[in-house]
Structure formats: C-alpha cells, structure tokens
UniProtKB/Swiss-Prot annotation:
This is Chromosome partition protein MukB. The keyword Signal does not apply. HAMAP family: MukB. Homodimerization via its hinge domain. Binds to DNA via its C-terminal region. Interacts, and probably forms a ternary complex, with MukE and MukF via its C-terminal region. The complex formation is stimulated by calcium or magnesium. Interacts with tubulin-related protein FtsZ. It comes from Serratia proteamaculans (strain 568). ATP binds at residues 34-41.
C-alpha cells in the first residue's frame, strides 16, 4: 500500500510576531487556538503563500470581509510581514519518503503600492536533523540571529553534500515540481488551474458553501476529458490535415505540370544559352584559329604580292623608259613626217608665190605710171579748187562783213582792219615790206608767174626721176638677191659675191640629186639597226626573266630545252588537276558524311541520354538491345512479385487496423452490438466497469472472467429474461451477470490464484482454469498499451506498404520508360558514336584540306613554271630569226657613214631648194651689179625741193589775191563816203561772188572727177602693192620657214618618213600594250595588295578583337563552369544535341523559354527578380544562378516526407509516383478517420455514464457525513434536455442531417454546432463561431448539470444553499464538497504522476468554533477516513484529545511584538504530552 505524503511542518521567518517559528503539523488535524489578533490567520496566510505564491490570487481577509469585492490595499500580505527578508517554508515527506522543503522568500517593496516581492524555491535531499529555522537563519549571539538572504541560503545549501537548491522564475515550474513530488493534488498548468486551486483553498479557509465553487462544480469535479476531446481535435486536425494534404496533393498534382513546365523551360532557357555560349566559344576559338591562319596566309600572300609588285614595277619602269624612248622616236618621226609634209607644202607655196610676184611686179610698174599722172592732175585740180574755194569763202566773208556793217560804222572799221590784216599777211608771206593795196595787183601777177614756173620745173624733175628709177630698180633687185642668198654684202662686193654663188651652183645641184638614194639607203640601215636594238632588248628581257645571260648562238639549244620542260610541266599540270579532283571528291564525300552524321547525332544523343537514364534507374550497364529487352522482362517479374508482397502487407495492415478499431471502442466493447444490448437491458458492460484497472492487474482479471469478460452487468436478471426472447442481433455467446454496476466486485466467483493463472469454480462440478493472457486486453490501460503496440505495428506496415507501393509504381514507370525507349530509341541507341566518327572525319577533312592547299600551292608553282616556259618559248620564237641580225656588229658604223653623206646632200638640197629661184633670177642681172647708180638720190632731193617751192609760190599768190580782193576796204575812212562805197562794193562783191562760185563749182566738179579717177588708180595701185607686199612677205616667210624646217622636200621623203613613223608606231603600240598590261597587272596587284592590306588590317583587328572576346569570354565561361560544376547542373545544361543547332535557333529557343518563364514565375518575387537579372546578355553566369535558384526553389518545395531525393527532376518523377499512392492512401484514411455521428453520441453518452458512476462513488463516501441537522450530502448529476435531444438525434436520426456531416467544407465540430442550432433555434448563440460551439458540444461536461443536495431533518433532500443552513451546517457541507473535489482531482491526475506517489491532502478551516462538537468529531472522522490533514483555527481549544493544538498569545515586550506559542498533542489513546515553546526573541 502506497503511503500518502504528509506536510511535516510550517516555518515562518521574520513575519509580524514570528521571527523564526516552526509549526509541526499533525497527520490529521492541527488546531491553532488563540484570541483575536493572536496570529492564527497570519500562520494560515504563510502556509497558503508558500503553497500558491501568486500575487494576482492572494487576498487575505477576515471573515467580516467575506463577499466584499475589495479588501485592504495590500490584500492582507504586506501588513503581515516585517521589514527585510522573510521566508515561509513547508517541510514535506512524500510517498517516496523524500524530504522536500518548498517555500518562498518574501520582501516588502518600498512605495505607496505596498507591494511584496516573492521568490519561490525548493530544497531537496535535506537531512532530517537539519531544521528549517537553522537553515534560514544564522546565529550571531546567544539570543540573536540573522535572517539569511536568498543567495546566502543558496550558498549554504550548496555547501551541503547531496542537497539540491532550485530557484524558480515561473510559478508554473514551481507547481510542476511540487506536483511531481506529490505536494499538490493536481498539475497546475495555467493561471486558471492555479485560480481553481486557490479558490478551493480560500473556500476551505473561510468555510461555508463557496458560490465560486458551486457555480463551477463541473470544472472542479468533472475532469476534462482531454483524451476524448483531444481525440476529436486530433481527428478533426487529422481530417483537416488530411483534406489539406489531399488538396495540397491536388494542387501539387496540378502544379506538377507547372513544375515540369518550369523545369523544362528553365532548362531550355539556360541550356540553350549555355550551349549557345559554348558553341559561340567554340566558334570563336575556331574563328580565331581560322583568322590566325588567314592572317598568316594573307601575310605570306602579301609578301608574294609585294615581291611580284616590285618585279612588275621594275619591268614597268623599264618598259616606261623604253616607251619614253620609243615615244621620243615616234614623236621625232611624226615631227619629221610633218616637217617633210610641211616642207613639201611650203615648197609648193613658194613656187606659186614666186609666179604671182613676177606677174604683180609687171602690173605694179604699169600702175605706178598711171597713178603718177593722175597724181599730178589731182594736185593741179586740188590747187585750183582750193583757190576757188578760198576766193568764194573770202567773198562771202567780205559780203557778210559788209552786210553786217551796212548800218554801223563798226562794220566798216572791221573790214578795214581785216584788209589791213590781209595786207600784213601778204607782206609776210611774199616778204614784200613795200607791199600796199595799190601795188598788190602788180605783185599778184609777178607771183602768179613764179607759181607757173615752179610747177613746170616740178613736172620736169618728176619725169627725170621716173627714168632713173627704172635703172635703180634692176640694181636693187640684183643686190637684194645677193643679200638674200649670201647675207649682208656691201654694194661694192655684191658683184664678186654673186659670181661665186653662181659658180658653186652646179655642184650643189649634183649633191641635191643624191639625197633620195642616200635617204632610202639610210632608212634601210636604220630599220635594220632598230630591229637589231629590238632584238637586243628582247634578249635582255629574256635573260632578265630567266636570271641568266645567254648568247645569241645558245638560243636554239635553250629553245629545245624549254620545249622539253614545257611538255613535262604540261603533263604535271594535267596530273595535278586529276589529283585535285580526286581530293575534292573525297572532301565532298567527307562533308556529305559529316552532314549526315550531324543530322543523326542529336537523335543518337537523345537515345544515349535516355539510355543513361535507364542505366541510372536500373543500375545495370545496358550494352545491347538484348540486355534492354531482358531487363524489361525482369522488371515485369519484379513488378508482379512486389505487387503480391504489397497486397500481403495491405491485408496485414487492414487486420491490424481492424484490431485497433475494435480496441478503440469506448468501454472496451469489441462488439458494437454489446453496447446496444447494454443500453437496451439497462446494464453496463463488465469491461466498462473494469475500465480503470491497471495494466498490472489486467492479466488477472482477464483470466478471472475468461470468456465472460465481455458480459453485461444488469441489476436484475429476471427483468432481462423477457428481452432475451426473440433476440437475434447479438454475439453467439452472450454473458449476463447480476450485480450493482455502482458497487460491483469480483465475489461472484470462487477463485484460486496460481502462478500466472487462476482456477475459477463456476459451479460445484464445473471449474475453469485460465492462464494469464500474453496480451491482456482487459481494462483501458491494457487496451491502450496494446493499441500503442498495434499503432507501432501499423506504422511499420504502412511504411512498408508505402515503400512497396512506391517500388511498384517505380517499377511500372521504369517499365514504361523501357517501353518508350524500345519504341523510340532502340533502333539507334547502340549504333556507333556519330560524334567520334565526326571527329575522325573532321581530322581527315583537315588533312585533305591541308594537302589540297599544299597541292594548290605546288600546282600554282608548276603553272607559273609552265607559263614562264611558255613565255620563254614564245620569246625564243621571236628571237631565233634575229640571231644573224644580233651578230651584225658593223651595222652602226655604216649607218653613221650614210647619215653623214645624207646630211651633206640634204644641206645642198636645202640650199638649192631655198635659193634656187634667187640664183636663177640673179644670173641675168649679174652685169647690173658692176655699176651703182648713186645719182638717183640727187634727183629725188631736187624733186622734193621743187615740190616745196611750188607749194610756197601757191601760198604767196593766194595771199596777194586776198589783198587785191580787199583793196576797197582800205578806203573806209569816212563813214558817209564809205556808205556809197559800200553799196558799190557790195554789188561788185556779189558779182565776183557769183563768178567765184561758178568757178568753184567747175573746179569742184573737175576735182571730183579727177579724184574719183585718182582714187581708182590709187586703189588699184594700193591693191597691187598690198598684194605684192603680202605675197612678198609671205614668200619671205615661207622661204624662212622652209629654211627653218631644215628638211629637204623631195618626192620620196614623205614616204620614208611615213614608213619610219609607222614602224615606230607599231613598236610603240606593242610597248604600250605591254606597259598597259603591266600597269593593269600592277594596278590589279596594287589593288590586290590594298585589298590584302585592308584584309590584313581587318583580319588583325578582327583577330585581336575576337581573341580579346575569347579571353574575356573565357573568364566569364570559367565563372559559369565553376557555378555549373559546384552546383552539379552540368549534366542538365550540357545537352550535346543542342550543339548541332545554330545560334539563332538557340536564341529563339531561349527567348521562347524566357517568355514562358516570365509567366511561370510572375507570382514568385525572388525568381522574378533573379530572372530579370539573368536577362543581361553580358552576364551569362546570372542565367546559371537563375537555374540554380529554380532548382533551390523546387528543392524547398519538395516534400521530404514523401520524396526521397533532392533533385527536382527526380523529385517530379517520384512525385508522380508518390502523389498517386498518397492520394489513394489519404482518401482511404479520410474514410477511416471520418467518425460517424452515432459514434460521437455513444462516446459522449459513455463518458457521461462513467462520470455519473464516478459521482455516485464519491457520493457513497459522503453518505455518513453529518453536520447538525444535515444527515447526508450528495451530488446530483442530470443531463440537459437540449443536449439530450442532440444526442438522440446524433444516434438515431443522423440520416436526416447528412448534408452537414458529409460536407467537405465543414468540420465535424462545425457540423455539430449547425445541428445544435437547427434543433434549438430559440437559443441565442451570441458572437461565438460554429467551431467554438462545436468544440463545446464535444465536451461532455457541457451536457451535465451538477447540484449539491443535503438531507436535513424532516425536509428531506434539499438543494444546499447557505440561506437554508446554519453556519456550522454550511461549513460542514462546504468541507464535504471540497473533500470530494480533492478526491476527484487526485483520481484525475493519477495517470499523470508516478505510480508510487500519493499526494498530500490538506485543507483549512478558520473560525472552527462555529461547529459543534459532533461536527468537529465528524471532521476528525472524515480526515481519518480520507487520510487528510486539516488546519483549523478557533478562539478556544477544540477537542484537544485528538490532533495537535497550538495556543497562540500575542505579547508586547520592550516595544517588540511577538507571539507566544504553546503546543499540545492529542491524548485520546495515549498519555497527554504537552509541549510549550518559549517566547521568541525577535
């Protein structure tokens, strides 16, 4: 028997009146006796504070404050303490005989709020000899002690060996340890639990029927069916989780395509870009190598072109030089031809002009004579006309002057003055100072005679001059001819010079006749010389091209050698062409094969990927199609075996679940029909009565009752007899036992207990021997133990079933994968590696291309040699006929000799041609040159002088005529006399004027006639002179030009000059053609060089740029490769089949995937940001980071509880397998988890029945309790009507409300709340949610109503109320209720604490004096029967014969207040022992 724990003592340190006091507590009743203010309540307050150190609950008031809403300000604690550190400790000895000291350290906090600081602590393992006061205080003198602080206490305790000190910051931890050690009856998990415990202690302390407890009896007495409630909550949570899991699975299944899509598109997006960069890197590397090869080749080609350019430039310079010489020669020949043609034309013009000059000379002589005569006549007529004109003018002037002076004197004076002026002018001209108006007429006759004489003398001299001019003209002509031929010669040497010229004339004519033969001979020799020079030039060019000097005699042998070489080179070129054609054909075949393999490679790579995946899945090395088919057969066999094993495991799992379901029935009823029959018979299942049996006693009772362990206990078998008739729905064996279900025991059998077996004597002649079952199932503890085992077994079977299901589906998927592989890839999977063949073919192609390039270079060299040999033979064909000409060494001398003779002949011919006519004319005039007619100049001077005299005579005669005409004017001395004179003069003047005008008219007419005739003669003469002068000048110019031309104009000169020019033109054309060809070749070469240089610069720029790109890309590629390899995604990204797609296709693939990814990750901010960053084309590593982020995101989304891999791709494959299995399993689980409404009603009813039975058992313990007129106390338990209706509907009419319980949108609790509202529409549910109401309806306590009833006097059973009872009766009734609550708590908490722990029972009662002696005795009896401790307080001793009594007296000594305590132990059955303690020294 387990002993109940007991409180041994209470210690107060530094409380008001108690410095260090320990109260030993009695095992039953401890009484505190004393007057008012003695310290009884303080002692009890210290006990309660140590028991419940919660300042939010503690409120110590006296009985006068009962029912008050507020007490003292400090709630009764602050005033009970003294300044400094205070302690309140309880010394407990629990069922394990462990000494435990629990207590609190209290200290007042300064301030108006009068707060108290509390620190709970526990001391374990304290030796029995150590008293609490010794532990908490330190002696400092004989009668003085000091209270230790908490830290000092801790240090002191830790110094003790084996003693533990624990300080708590949480009241929950403090109470949890107290519950585990058996100090308090219930685990106080929360503040509400502490509040209940405190309210119980408070009700016990102040006594009476506590309304706070009676109103909440359900919470105090009825244990919370946390198991059932938790089962419902777990069921709902499991259903909710199951539905959420199913929904998540459905969402996951719907998201599976999204995951696949995300993986596929991310792989396409990143792998396409990854392979595009890999391809571009390979292309860039190949491009860089190709550019480098092109660069080197271009440099070599540029060097060759530069060498060729230098050679062609040198040859062009030579050709240009030769062309310049040829152009000079050609231009000279052309100029010579032009000069010859010009000379011929000049010669013709000279001859024509010489004839014209002879004719013009004759005509000019005749016309000179005619003009001379006409000139004389013209002079005479002019003089006559001039004189007539002067006379008319003078007369008119005189007449005008006279007319003007007719009326004025001035006019006469003017005329007179004019007459004087005319007289002076005449005197001046005639040099006659004595001339007067009277003798003017005389002198006029004289001077007119002089004029006549002068005119006659002039005519005579003119005739003489013309005769002298004829002789003088012949001499001059001859002199001019000599000067023209021989140059400047004196007139005296002219005859001698002319004779010498005429003497040399015949020899020069002979030389001139040899010009044409010499010219023809020279032309032939020059032509031959030019041919020799051309041949020498051709030979030099030939030697220069061949780099060797050859003699003309060696040309024949050289030609034969070149012809043989040309034949061999021609054969080599032909063979090279055939070889080149063969290599090109082979190259085309290789390229065609590479294209075919390139087309096949992606298909083969896809097949290899599929094959590698199959190899990874199977773990086999699949090397042939036969192995694939054999392994596929193995998969079929494995699938069959795994399916069989899975079905076996499923059957075992169903069997275990059936056992679990049977054992999970409430009350232990394995057959649900027994529950129905028990309700029908009004009995209780035997298993339900023994439901609380321990697991240790379960085998005994199971063997004791044997097959009847499933019997129904009924109050009266006779009442059941009639119900058994016609009973069909029942087990095969139905056991019925008569007995009271409330007080049933095992006395119905005679039993002998043996070693792990029992012998049951069911009758005198019938025994039953039953062994203890190996797996007992009798009692809730045994069933729960078995359920734990079955649950563990079910979990193992479920795990095994899940593994087998997964293996089956994995095998099926592997079989499907093999089937797809056989259908799609088997035909090509085991073919040879096309990439290896491509690499070999690429190597061979490179070799062929290099050989072809070398062959092209050799062929080009051979062709050049062939062309050189061909050109050499062509040059030799031109040089061979000229060998004799090249050997002629005297040709140049002969040409020079003939050229000198030709020059002499040409000089003679030019002299004859230039002066032949002059010599012909000079020959007859040679004799004229012997005498020089110098007197011709004297005659010319006389003629000029005669002309001057004749003109002067004419002027003098005219001046005298004017004076004679103005003689009348000299007489104007008198104006009167002058008037008459004027009239006469006017008439005369008019007559004279008329006569003069007539004379003038005749003179003018005659002058006009002679002028016209003279003009005509003069014009003819001028024309002849002009023509003569022009032709003479032209002849001089022509002769000078002919001399300047310096070419002998003959009949053959033009033909020779033209022939020479044509030859030079042909040579120049040939040279120009060659030069143009060289220029074109040079231009083409320069263009080729420029192109090569541009190409070279571009190649260098492109090469260095590409090389820089390659170097730059290498760093980025290294970063990409590090990311790829570090994260293990290279196998996913390096898809070799993508290497056969071009950049545009890969970019298009990546762009399409990017568009799909933007939609796929639009709801994921992280992936959306990473995707946006990955779009930077300059940062390819960000795409890898995005791919890694996608993988990481998917890894995080992998359900590790159902997926066994970290690879999202494999996870998706496993997900497809596992989700299907989980869907089936969870659907089945939901059907199993879904509890029926009838089962819920049965569970609640069974729980209500069990609690009713438990309350009846508690009532049995209170039947003998009596206080005053109260003879008995009991608890009445009733089911609420509305809740009873709900249970009836749940058990019998659930089909009518399946719309609530079959709804997936409602939990069971919500459906239950909806049904309660439907059944009770009149009840207001307030603001509570259906879930809250449903959870309350799942708590059986809400179905019950508890009332305390007392049997009092003649009134019978009455409801226990304070107003209907006396104070003592109320105190006793309240104490009974509290004892019942404590018992209920202990039973409720029995399974929560150790099996060897029985908790302490202690209650309080203040003001116990209100109870009579009988009631006090009842309390003592109750404490004895229930092993309960009780602390009571009263002003006077109460029943000192039992328990322990302390007498408390408060005293004041030297201003120090203390309590004097005297202890007395009960003396009912033993001698009284009186213990008195001395007063404390504060």
């Amino acid at each position: 028997m387990i002993e109940r724990g007991k409180f041994r003592s209470l210690t107060l340190v530094n409380w008001n009146g108690f410095f260090a006091r320990t109260f030993d507590l009695d095992e039953l009743v401890t009484t505190l006796s004393g007057g008012n203010g003695a310290g009884k309540s303080t002692t009890m307050a210290a006990f309660v504070t140590a028991l419940i150190p919660d300042l939010t609950l503690l409120h110590f008031r006296n009985t006068t404050e009962a029912g008050a809403t507020s007490g003292s300000r400090d709630k009764g604690l602050h005033g009970k303490l003294r300044a400094g550190v205070c302690y309140s400790t309880l010394d407990v000895l629990n069922s394990r005989h462990q000494r435990v000291v629990v207590g609190v350290r209290l200290q007042q906090v300064a301030g108006r709020d009068r707060k108290v600081d509390i620190k709970p602590f526990v001391i374990q393992g304290l030796p029995t000899a150590v008293q609490p006061t010794e532990l908490l205080t330190q002696t400092v003198g004989e009668r003085q002690a000091r209270v230790l602080s908490l830290q000092e206490l801790k240090d002191r305790v830790e110094e003790m060996e084996g003693v533990q000190f624990k300080q708590f910051n949480s009241i929950t931890d403090y109470h949890s340890l107290m519950f585990d050690l058996g100090v308090i009856p219930k685990r106080l998990r929360s503040s509400s639990d502490r509040s209940k415990f405190y309210r119980l202690i408070e009700a016990s302390l102040y006594g009476g029927i506590s309304s706070a407890i009676t109103r909440s009896l359900r919470d105090y007495l009825l244990p919370e069916n946390s198991g059932v409630r938790k089962a419902f909550q777990d069921m709902e949570a499991a259903l909710r989780e199951n539905r959420m899991t199913l929904e998540a699975i459905r969402v996951t299944q719907s998201d599976r395509d999204l995951f696949k899509h995300l993986i596929s598109e991310a792989t396409s997006y990143v792998a396409a870009d990854y392979m595009r960069h890999a391809n571009e890197r390979r292309i860039h590397l190949d491009g860089a190598l190709a550019l480098r090869n092109d660069l080197l080749g271009s440099r070599k080609q540029l060097a060759a072109e530069q060498y060729r350019h230098v050679e062609m430039a040198r040859e062009l310079a030579e050709q240009s030089g030769a062309e310049s010489d040829l152009e000079t020669d050609y231009q000279a020949a052309s100029d010579h031809l032009n000069l010859v043609q010009t000379a011929m034309r000049q010669q013709e013009k000279i001859e024509r002009y010489e004839g014209d000059l002879e004719e013009l000379t004759y005509r000019l002589e005749e016309q000179n004579e005619v003009v001379a005569e006409a000139s004389e006549q013209q002079a005479e007529n002019e003089a006559r006309a001039e004189a007539a004109e002067l006379e008319v003018d003078e007369l008119k002037s005189q007449l005008a002057d006279y007319q003007q002076a007719l009326d004025v004197q001035q006019t006469r004076a003017i005329q007179y003055q004019q007459a004087l002026q005319a007289l002076d002018r005449a005197r001046t001209l005639c040099q006659l100072p004595e001339l007067t108006a009277e003798n003017a007429e005389h002198w006029l006759d004289t001077f007119q005679a002089r004029e006549q004489e002068a005119t006659e003398a002039l005519l005579m001299l003119e005739q003489k001059l013309s005769v002298a001019d004829a002789a003088h003209g012949q001499f001059e002509q001859a002199y001019q001819l000599v000067g023209k031929i021989a140059g400047q010669v004196s007139r005296s040497e002219a005859w001698q010079c002319a004779r010498e010229l005429l003497r040399d004339w015949p020899s020069q004519q002979h030389l001139a006749e040899r010009v044409q033969p010499l010219r023809m001979r020279l032309s032939e020799l020059e032509q031959r010389l030019r041919s020799q020079q051309d041949a020498e030039r051709l030979l030099q060019e030939f030697c220069k091209r061949h780099g060797q000097q050859y003699q003309p005699d060696e040309l024949d042998a050289l030609q034969q050698e070149l012809e043989e070489r040309l034949e061999s080179l021609s054969q080599g070129v032909s063979d090279a062409g055939e070889r080149r054609m063969e290599m090109r054909q082979e190259l085309e075949q290789i390229q065609q094969r590479i294209r075919e393999l390139t087309t096949r490679a992606p298909i083969w790579l896809a097949a290899q990927d599929a094959l590698s995946q199959l190899g990874e899945q199977s773990g086999e090395a699949l090397e042939s199609s036969q192995q694939v088919t054999e392994y596929m057969q193995q998969l079929l066999e494995r699938e069959r075996e795994t399916t069989v094993e899975r079905d076996e495991v499923a059957a075992g799992k169903r069997a275990v679940e059936a056992q679990i379901e049977r054992l999970s029935q409430p009350g232990g009823a394995e057959d649900q029909r027994l529950v129905t029959l028990a309700e029908r018979f009004g009995g209780v299942l035997l298993s339900e009565i023994y439901d609380d049996v321990t697991i240790d006693d379960a085998p005994y009772f199971s063997a004791l009752y044997g097959p009847s362990r499933h019997a129904i206990v009924v109050p009266d078998l006779s009442l059941v007899r009639e119900m058994l008739e016609g009973l069909e729905d029942c087990p095969e064996d139905l056991y019925l036992i008569e007995g009271d279900p409330q007080s049933f025991d095992d006395s119905v059998f005679a039993v002998e207990e043996q070693d792990r077996a029992v012998l049951v004597k069911t009758a005198e002649r019938q025994w039953r021997y039953s062994r203890y079952p190996a797996v007992p199932l009798f009692g809730r503890a045994a069933r729960e133990n078995r359920l734990e085992i079955l649950h563990a077994e079910r979990e193992k079977l479920a795990e095994r079933y899940a593994t087998l299901s997964f293996d089956v589906q994995k095998t099926q998927r592997s079989h499907q994968a093999f089937s797809r592989f056989i259908g799609n890839h088997l035909a090509v999977a085991f073919d040879a590696d096309p990439e290896a063949e491509i690499r070999g073919l690429n190597t061979r192609r490179g070799e062929i291309e290099r050989a072809l390039n070398n062959h092209e270079a050799q062929n080009q060299q051979q062709r050049q040699q062939y062309d050189q040999a061909k050109e050499g033979i062509s040059a030799l064909n031109r040089l061979t006929p000229l060998v004799s000409l090249l050997n002629d060494e005297t040709l140049q001398d002969r040409v020079e000799e003939i050229r000198e003779e030709l020059e002499e002949a040409q000089d003679a011919a030019r002299h004859i041609q230039q002066h032949g006519v002059s010599l012909t004319k000079l020959e007859p005039l040679l004799s004229v040159l012997q005498s020089d007619p110098q007197q011709h100049e004297q005659l010319q001077q006389d003629y000029t002088q005669a002309q001057s005299v004749q003109r002067q005579a004419k002027q003098q005669a005219f001046a005298l005529i004017e004076v004679v005409q103005r003689r009348a004017h000299f007489s104007y001395t008198d104006s009167a006399g002058m008037q008459n004179a004027n009239n006469d003069l006017n008439d005369k003047l008019r007559q004279r004027l008329e006569h003069a005008e007539a004379e003038r008219t005749r003179a003018r007419e005659q002058l006009r006639q002679y002028q016209t005739q003279f003009t005509q003669y003069s014009q003819v003469l001028a024309s002849l002179k002009s023509s003569y002068d022009a032709k003479r000048d032209m002849l001089k110019e022509l002769s000078q030009e002919l001399v300047d031309i310096g070419v002998q104009a003959d009949a053959n000169a033009e033909a020779r000059a033209r022939t020479r020019r044509d030859e030079l033109h042909a040579g120049l054309s040939t040279n120009r053609a060659r030069r143009n060809q060289l220029e074109k070749q040079l231009t083409f070469c320069e263009a080729e060089m420029d192109s090569l240089q541009k190409k070279l610069r571009k190649l260098e720029r492109d090469y260095y740029q590409l090389r820089e790109q390659v170097v730059t890309a290498k760093a980025g590629w290294c970063a990409v490769m590090r990311l790829v390899k570090d994260n293990g995604v290279e196998r996913r990204l390096h898809r070799r089949e993508l290497a056969y797609m071009d950049g545009d296709e890969l970019r298009s693939m990546s762009d399409k995937a990017l568009g799909a990814l933007r939609l796929a990750v639009s709801d994921n901010e992280h992936l959306r940001d990473v995707l946006r960053l990955s779009e930077d084309p300059k940062r390819p590593e960000r795409k890898i980071q995005f791919y890694i982020a996608v993988y990481q995101h998917l890894r995080e989304r992998i359900r590790q509880d159902i997926i066994r891999t970290d690879d999202p791709v494999e996870a998706i494959e496993q997900m497809e397998i596992e989700l299907g299995r989980l869907t089936e399993e969870l659907t089945a689980r939901e059907q199993k988890l879904a509890i029926s409404s009838k089962s819920v009603a049965n569970i609640i009813r069974k729980t209500i029945q069990r609690e009713q039975n438990r309350i009846r058992m508690l009532n049995q313990g209170l039947q003998a309790v009596s206080f005053g007129q109260v003879k008995s106390v009991r608890l009445n338990v009733n089911v609420r009507e509305a809740h009873a209706t709900l249970l009836d509907v749940l058990s019998e009419q659930q089909e009518q409300h399946q719309d609530l319980f079959n709804s997936n949108r409602l939990t069971f609790s919500e459906a239950l709340a909806k049904l309660y509202q439907r059944l009770n529409p009149q009840i207001d549910m307030g603001q509570r949610t259906p879930q809250t109401i449903g959870e309350e309806l799942l708590d059986y306590r809400n179905y019950l109503e508890l009332e305390v009833e007392v049997f009092r006097g003649s009134d019978g059973w009455l409801r226990a109320e304070s107003g209907a009872l006396s104070t003592g009766e109320a105190i006793g009734t309240g104490m009974s209720i509290l004892v019942m609550v404590v018992q209920s708590w202990e039973e409720e908490s029995r399974r929560l604490r150790g099996k060897d722990i029985s908790p302490c029972r202690l209650l309080f009662l203040d003001e116990a004096a209100r109870l009579d002696a009988k009631s006090i005795a009842t309390l003592f009896e109750l404490c004895d029967r229930l092993e309960m401790q009780l602390i009571i307080a009263a002003p006077e001793n109460i029943s000192p014969e039992k328990g322990t009594t302390y007498k408390l007296v408060r005293k004041v000594f030297q201003n120090h207040e203390h309590v004097h305590v005297v202890g007395l132990r009960g003396f009912a059955n033993e001698p009284p022992v009186l213990g008195v303690t001395a007063a404390e020294t504060p």
